Amino acid sequence: MPRTQRNDNFIDKTFTVVADILLKVLPTSQREKQAFSYYRNGMSAQAEGEYAEALQNYYEAMRLEVDAYDRSYILYNIGLIHTSNGEHGRALEYYYQALERNPSLSSALNNIAVIYHYRGEQAIENGQSEISQILFEKAADYWKEAIRLAPTNYIEALNWLKMTGRLTGLAT
């Protein structure tokens, strides 16, 4: 059974119906429609925690999708899966690729910052205070850019920047 027919969630069903209508109505190529269909199936599988299936759909969408902006969201979602699986290095690679195609993707900037912050915390636990400071500075840089792009989305990050004295260079 196709993934789109397995959704039990009202919002997922609504999204699927609207997406199907848009695919039929909008003047897009068959390739673009296929890419979107794989992307949509990937999102659905990801929401259900079916990461292997989601990745298969995202990779297929990447093979078909030519638009850089659309590819950025596919790459971002692949990064999310790797983050969920604890594969932070791989996640960073995908977030960076997403940002190359869409520098305004604040959620990718935020997720990169979260990973650097997490690594900074790990460095502290391992007694590597100098390394932790470098990692925290990287996190701060990415959070500042995310906040610049989406000022109301990252309140916790903004508070962390204020509390740690790293708010310089950001108009608030």
Curated annotation (Swiss-Prot):
Which keywords, in A-to-Z order, does the entry hold?
Chloroplast, Membrane, Photosynthesis, Plastid, Repeat, Thylakoid, TPR repeat
Q: List the disulfide bonds.
A: none
Entry membrane topology = Peripheral membrane protein
- Localization, UniProt: Plastid, Chloroplast thylakoid membrane
Choose any GO biological process term that the UniProt entry carries and state it.
photosystem I assembly
- Pfam families, alphabetized: TPR_1
Q: Where are the TPR repeats?
A: 35-68, 72-105, 120-153
Q: Name one GO cellular component term.
A: chloroplast thylakoid membrane
- Give the matching PROSITE patterns: TPR, TPR_REGION
Q: Which residues form a coiled coil?
A: none
Q: Which family does it belong to?
A: Belongs to the Ycf3 family.
Record's function text: Essential for the assembly of the photosystem I (PSI) complex. May act as a chaperone-like factor to guide the assembly of the PSI subunits.
HAMAP family in the cross-refs: Ycf3
Identification of the protein by name = Photosystem I assembly protein Ycf3
Instruction: State the species of origin.
Output: Chlamydomonas reinhardtii (Chlamydomonas smithii)
| Source organism phylogeny | Eukaryota, Viridiplantae, Chlorophyta, core chlorophytes, Chlorophyceae
